[in-house]
Amino acid sequence: MTETDGFYKSREVFDPAEQYKMDHKRRGVALIFNHERFFWHLTLPERRGTNADRDNLTRRFSDLGFEVKCFNDLRAEELLLKIHEVSTSSHIDADCFICVFLSHGEGNHVYAYDAKIEIQTLTGLFKGDKCQSLVGKPKIFIIQACRGSQHDVPVVPLDMVDHQTDKLDNVTQVDAASVYTLPAGADFLMCYSVAEGYYSHRETVNGSWYIQDLCEMLARYGSSLEFTELLTLVNRKVSQRRVDFCKDPDAIGKKQVPCFASMLTKKLHFCPKPSK
């Protein structure tokens, strides 16, 4: 029977334009885990500017119809409890799910207030055997964290003029350590603020480059452009930035390029929902 089923499946019409269904009652939940301060024993610096990222993302996701839930500086045990509660709740009437981490990172981990958590532990809670109501639906993880010990050396076209900030107190900082690109499974989309092995930049007033530009693109094209195409625009926007003011002189002039790993199987559009 398995061979017969496979034979008939191979004969099905393949539609390259097929989209995820976004006509459920709810858009879905968007979790934002925001970490500004850390337990002193971790010796991690404060992430000044991260609250601007949190607020910016809250506005953008709310505009797209998501139920946004923000959590600040949770301990690892608290964070795991929150995300387990969401993974075991019903998403049957939801279009999709989003989870955002604004923190420091290292290897295949991100940091909560007092300890690091393996990313695959988090994504694993939303795989089909653990969260059946999200089977076949987009599961988007956005990770704003540093991913290495290198800066991207700029090679700038002669006719390009880089943006200069007017406020000297809006200093650029980097998020500590590194995060690896991780596979998660079908219908997952892993979005990273920077390519593996490089620094992720964050302004102390305006927030991180990646989240600033992601939110700008969501505001302009969030309900009209296919989401991975929108992420490509974000890559372009961030890559056009450079560090102008930083306490580390070696960082001046350096650049950044985000990346995303898509395991989506259809096109993803956040089509506007009918007014209630």
Swiss-Prot record:
Changing C146A: Does not affect ability to promote ZBP1-mediated pyroptosis, apoptosis, and necroptosis (PANoptosis). SMART domains: CASc. GO terms for cellular component: cytoplasm; cytosol; nucleoplasm; nucleus. InterPro entries: Caspase-like_dom_sf, Caspase_cys_AS, Caspase_his_AS, Pept_C14, Pept_C14_caspase, Pept_C14_p10, Pept_C14_p20, Pept_C14A. Residues 1-5, 163-175 form a propeptide. The active site is at H104, C146. During activation, the N-terminal disordered prodomain is removed by cleavage. Concomitantly, double cleavage gives rise to a large 18-kDa and a small 11-kDa subunit. The two large and two small subunits then assemble to form the active CASP6 complex. Can be cleaved and activated by different caspases, depending on the context. Cleaved and activated by caspase-8 (CASP8) and subsequently by caspase-3 (CASP3). Can also undergo autoactivation by mediating autocleavage at Asp-162 and Asp-175, while it is not able to cleave its N-terminal disordered prodomain. It holds the Pfam family Peptidase_C14. It comes from the Eukaryota. CDD domains: CASc (cd00032). The modification Phosphoserine is found at S62, S239. Phosphorylated by NUAK1; phosphorylation inhibits self-activation. Phosphorylation at Ser-239 by AMP-activated protein kinase (PRKAA1 or PRKAA2) inhibits autocleavage, preventing caspase activation, thereby preventing hepatocyte apoptosis. Belongs to the peptidase C14A family. This is Caspase-6. The lineage of its organism: Eukaryota, Metazoa, Chordata, Craniata, Vertebrata. The gene is Casp6.
